Amino acid sequence: MSKIQKKDTEPWVAKYRPKTVDDVSYQEDVISALKKSLNTGNLPHLLFYGPPGTGKTSTILAIAMDIYGPELMKQRVLELNASDERGIEVVRTKIKNFAGYAVNKTTTGTSNPGATFKLIILDEADSMTTDAQAALRRTIETTSKTTRFCLLCNYISRIIDPLASRCAKFRFKPLDTVATIERLKFISQQEGIKCEESVYQAIQVVSNGDMRKAITYLQSAFRFFANKISEDVIYNIAGSLPPQLIKQLVDCCKKNSFDRLQSMVQSIIAQGYPVSQVISQLFDYVLTTKDLNQSQKSHITMKIGNVDRNLIDGSEEFLQLFDLSSYIMKQLNNNSTSTNGDDMLIG
């Protein structure tokens, strides 16, 4: 493959990943604290947690680049995806072997020429088994003179306390609308993409604070549609329902007709939209609408939980979506708030 072809097919997530700590944006508190550690040359074990696509991996790779430079990165950084290599054997062999040997001080060309430690990055560490985490805790204790560990996870509650307590914890918050759109516009400018403001808004909505998703959606849309990107294109790529379709479903519920509602639900199913996604967007509607009072919202939310559980258990999708839609219709057209969320539960 030629260099031009490689450049054209390179994922933009990798292409526009921050190369240094100064390039990392939107996580100012985290970066400020980490810079102080880098300046003192005393990097602790780290635990980064937060939603996907908020910059956890990009930040630690940028830190590693600042410490070691591009050449030593290959020798002194071990990056593992703990969801694939999650068992105790990986800790006992690969991690322990890499962490065990000492290294010389880093030389010129790095921001921290006195660093005498290696770095092990464990992505998706919350997928590791409890036994593997316990073994890792012991490895961290015995190799702290030669190795620093950085654990990345979405759910800090899944990391055992003895392991979490040995790390400096940093929370990565979801990116807000302004930050996401600003970054998308920068990438669009670099790639020569022309989009309406509404397209960026649509990407922000479907990515829900996940910058990795947002950039991937933008690249996919540009690949297939060039500069003819519309809101509908973004919703199709993301597998989300266009807002107007959710509105049509809600309007159908307001008309209080089971026949019309059944036809509407059948139409949505026939168009191939994931029912889990439909339910998620209905949940967003319930939270934000002014057509329902707080009691009605709480009843519908309980119903959504029941339907979601039934879908996970393998219940028929049409029946579950029709059941939920019927319940929303009942609440929208009923002033009584005494309805129980299990009235129409279909297993």
Curated annotation (Swiss-Prot):
One of its GO terms (biological process) is DNA-templated DNA replication. The keyword Iron-sulfur does not apply. Keywords: ATP-binding, DNA replication, Nucleotide-binding, Nucleus. GO terms for cellular component: DNA replication factor C complex; Elg1 RFC-like complex; nucleus. InterPro entries: AAA+_ATPase (IPR003593), ATPase_AAA_core (IPR003959), DNA_pol3_clamp-load_cplx_C (IPR008921), DNA_Rep/Repair_Clamp_Loader (IPR050238), P-loop_NTPase (IPR027417), Rep_factorC_C (IPR013748), RFC_lid (IPR047854). One of its GO terms (molecular function) is ATP binding. SUPFAM superfamilies: P-loop containing nucleoside triphosphate hydrolases, post-AAA+ oligomerization domain-like. It is found in: Nucleus. SMART domains: AAA. ATP binds at residues 50-57. The elongation of primed DNA templates by DNA polymerase delta and epsilon requires the action of the accessory proteins PCNA and activator 1. This subunit may be involved in the elongation of the multiprimed DNA template. Belongs to the activator 1 small subunits family. Heteropentamer of various rfc subunits that forms a complex (RFC) with PCNA in the presence of ATP. NCBIfam families: PRK00440.1. This is Probable replication factor C subunit 4. The lineage of its organism: Eukaryota, Amoebozoa, Evosea, Eumycetozoa, Dictyostelia. The gene is rfc4.
